[in-house]
């Protein structure tokens, strides 16, 4: 199996609404492995760094304020196709355009409060993981259920 890692964050609105276990459960049920998790309140400069690619957008200032408004659950998930599938699991950026069954489609209502972030590609995933976690915070292990998820048994 060709494993990769992705950065997933539950935004302050998702944390405040008590959606942590629901979101974690969806990634676990799919068969992905959680390799790092922590709860942080990002500083404004840290949030600016996370969204540096969007600094010219009109919504940038509000986005940074939102991200630094409360606790964020930062996670790294591992598995085959986890970046692409993680995005599918999350749903469209705008919850109104998200399919039912996706995290945003089921749990979020408006674009400005869409509860979750996921890396959009391999390079972004590497950069975001490096920004949010020290290498020693990432745990390497083989999940007991792996042979039942991927085969080869």
From Swiss-Prot:
Its EC number is 2.7.4.6. It comes from the Eukaryota. Belongs to the NDK family. Its cofactor is Mg(2+). It is found in: Plastid, Chloroplast thylakoid lumen. Its main location: plastid. The active site is at 117 (pros-phosphohistidine intermediate). PROSITE patterns: NDPK, NDPK_LIKE. HAMAP family: NDP_kinase. CDD domains: NDPk_I. GO terms for molecular function: ATP binding; metal ion binding; nucleoside diphosphate kinase activity. It is an enzyme of class 2 (transferase). Optimum pH is 6.0. Keywords: ATP-binding, Chloroplast, Kinase, Magnesium, Metal-binding, Nucleotide metabolism, Nucleotide-binding, Phosphoprotein, Plastid, Thylakoid, Transferase. Major role in the synthesis of nucleoside triphosphates other than ATP. The ATP gamma phosphate is transferred to the NDP beta phosphate via a ping-pong mechanism, using a phosphorylated active-site intermediate. Shows the highest specificity towards GDP. One of its GO terms (cellular component) is chloroplast thylakoid lumen. It catalyses: a 2'-deoxyribonucleoside 5'-diphosphate + ATP = a 2'-deoxyribonucleoside 5'-triphosphate + ADP; a ribonucleoside 5'-diphosphate + ATP = a ribonucleoside 5'-triphosphate + ADP. One of its GO terms (biological process) is UTP biosynthetic process. The keyword GTP-binding does not apply. This is Nucleoside diphosphate kinase 3. InterPro entries: NDK-like_dom (IPR034907), NDK-like_dom_sf (IPR036850), Nucleoside_diP_kinase (IPR001564), Nucleoside_diP_kinase_AS (IPR023005). It comes from Spinacia oleracea (Spinach). Homohexamer. ATP binds at residues 11, 59, 87, 93, 104, 114. The keyword DNA-binding does not apply.
